[in-house]
């Protein structure tokens, strides 16, 4: 099956940085980096699991992140060592860097969320010490995954898979930010009484699905099944997402913080943000903070989609 690849930004690092099907793959720079990822995530979840310091949604997220990253990194190492790239069900041009980008973002979020919403409320002692150490190893893992992305991303003039290009990596970032937005708007009371806010939620969902479909098409080498050329699909998707997010960046803050639309311009006006409630439920985020976070994340994703649109026009596609 012909594969759509891009000429513009990459070094195909899997072939140049590792020796396929050999134990020497672990002694190459990329192999050593993946060993560091494997060890740091393993130590992180082991430290937390040994003292049970992962109860509640924030602790569960951190534990999931470290276990998931450890498991997938182990699979990648096994495939590299066994020379099984041709038998892997997903595109090996696109899968490792896609995972590395997601893993870097996952570990970054855990390295921030876990200590700020969970560890600081633990009593001083062995449990807290283990949690702090786990956070440190999470930071190490984040840096290791980010380094892999920097090493394996596309370089100008080279041929590689789409996910190694700037637009491909931006797709990963866009879906990750959308997932964070979904976490903040998980309480329907934030939006279900105003059609404008419901539209914003629809925007987040539609753009997330479209970006996710793009990633899956590339991971499955299925870009040729589209009824339109893949470059046209990418440009249209980026333009549509920019237009949608442009409406959300106006409507969400307007209806959440403007008193003319029953919004709350000040944090003190939100009963869920009172100090007594925050003390009783330290791991929760009050409604006003959620609204502000979604506003900021909407702006961040809008910038990402604008960059995606600009970079997508600079890609040159070839068939191999």
UniProtKB/Swiss-Prot annotation:
One of its GO terms (cellular component) is cell-cell junction. One of its GO terms (biological process) is positive regulation of substrate adhesion-dependent cell spreading. InterPro entries: Marvel, MYADM-like. It is a multi-pass membrane protein. Pfam families: MARVEL (PF01284). Keywords: Membrane, Repeat, Transmembrane, Transmembrane helix. It is found in: Membrane. The chain crosses the membrane at residues 35-55, 61-81, 95-115, 131-151, 165-185, 197-217, 233-253, 292-312. Residues 25-157, 162-317 form the MARVEL domain. Belongs to the MAL family. This is Myeloid-associated differentiation marker. It comes from Mus musculus (Mouse).
